[in-house]
């Protein structure tokens, strides 16, 4: 509640990301769009696009949307984060983004592996929005709920690959 990090948040977000993807597989869902909400989901885009999941038939056509909030934490995840993450896969280039696991670096990495970004709240760090634009990501700007909902639905329609089987 005070905004400080738990010492094991690195393991928690890894467990969460892997848990979500393994649950999807177990339930035999094949998502067209995976929408990640908030910093705690920041590893999902990496897992879907750069680890063993990228070649998994459940995820190889999935698009990833990341919603950004004004939920920045101070400090960084533990120093051993990158060592633990390397076990999951990726390349030297991928790991560079996670060398210093601050909020900004985690979210920039998440943006780089996402197909689109939604600014879901006022007060989102402008550096993240600028990073998304510079990396040619489709960005849905913050708007009142109904307006933004319509834009997100249109985004889903534009990204989704419908399997007719």
Predicted regions and their residues:
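Catalytic cores of nucleotide-sugar-dependent glycosyltransferases that transfer UDP/GDP/TDP-activated
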Residues: 1-165
């Amino acid at each position: 509640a005070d905004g400080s990090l738990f010492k094991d948040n690195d393991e928690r977000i890894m467990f969460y990301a892997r848990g979500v993807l393994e649950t999807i597989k177990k339930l035999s869902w094949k998502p067209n769009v995976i929408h990640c909400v908030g910093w705690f989901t920041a590893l999902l885009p990496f897992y879907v696009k750069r680890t063993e999941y990228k070649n998994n038939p459940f995820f190889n056509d999935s698009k990833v949307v990341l919603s950004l909030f004004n939920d920045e934490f101070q400090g960084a995840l533990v120093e051993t984060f990158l060592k633990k993450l390397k076990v999951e896969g990726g390349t030297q280039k991928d790991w560079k983004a996670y060398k210093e696991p601050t909020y900004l670096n985690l979210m920039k990495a998440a943006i780089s592996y996402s197909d689109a970004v939604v600014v879901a709240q006022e007060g989102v760090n402008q550096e993240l929005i600028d990073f998304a634009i510079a990396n040619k990501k489709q960005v849905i700007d913050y708007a009142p709920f109904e307006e933004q909902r319509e834009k997100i639905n249109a985004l889903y329609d534009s990204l989704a690959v419908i399997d007719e089987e």
